[in-house]
């Protein structure tokens, strides 16, 4: 089955080759039909983000998801480079 979640995963793996990629479907916490794929939380760790601003990281992720972004109602993005993630890994 080609779910939105699996497409997000495929596109981000291809574009960023992350060392950590956690995609959490949070749709169940919202007033949507059972099994909906509309709200996601994303934690992505890649050295591609080293010395890149948060805004540019978000833009790069949205660009990678360009083909499916209209299918997603909400996307919470937490992008890190390796060093940042090591400092914050207790929280993610």
Protein language model regions, located:
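Solvent-exposed beta-strand sheet faces enriched in polar/charged residues
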Residues: 24, 43-45, 76-80
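Short edge beta-strands and adjacent turn/loop segments
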Residues: 21-40
């Amino acid at each position: 089955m080609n779910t939105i979640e699996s497409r997000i995963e495929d596109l981000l793996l291809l574009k960023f080759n992350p060392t950590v990629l956690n995609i959490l479907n949070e749709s169940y916490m919202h007033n949507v039909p059972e099994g909906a794929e509309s709200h996601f939380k994303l934690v992505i760790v890649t050295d591609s983000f080293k010395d890149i601003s948060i805004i540019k990281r978000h833009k790069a992720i949205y660009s990678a998801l360009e083909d499916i972004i209209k299918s997603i109602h909400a996307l919470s993005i937490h992008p890190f480079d390796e060093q940042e993630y090591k400092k914050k890994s207790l929280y993610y």
